[in-house]
Amino acid sequence: MKLQLISDFNLELLKRNLESKNVAEIDEVEVCKYGQLYQSIFSLKEDLSSVRFIWSLPENHIHEFKKALIAEDIRRDILIEEIDTYATSIIDLAKRSKNVLVPTWCKLYHYQTYGISDWKIEMGIARIISDMNIRLSENFSNIANIYLIDSSDWNLNSKEYRNQKLWYLTKVPFQPKVFSK
């Protein structure tokens, strides 16, 4: 099987980690161009033997979420529309793929939140992320070959897993050990 990694950040470390494990089922690991999330999704040809792994940071393509991160008012209807657009592009890709794997979005260390009110208010970052993941799940519920992966198991919010220098140098938001989980 061919595994194609698609992201809006650098997944070269994940590729190297997968290749070093010599997984028998994976013949080839390919990383799409850095920062070319939508371009990669739209340009990939039909390959019903390929598994596509799409890992994104929501603030890079869900503009209403990015507004929420900087404490601007958001419109829920636009947020839902943006999530649906993202989901539709993944559903279209699934028609050209064996399987599509999509890690859920999670609250990352650099997100400013509203503390104990984060789940109470509509603008709470934790609440918005949860709502976005639920919306993705609803969009994908009837698509047999799209799988949401619970990324909270990866502990991405821990200081142990982040490295600012790595981000600035290579555009990888996580320590290499995240990719070996």
Provide a role label for each language-model segment.
Residues 1-181:
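Extracellular glycan-modifying ectodomains
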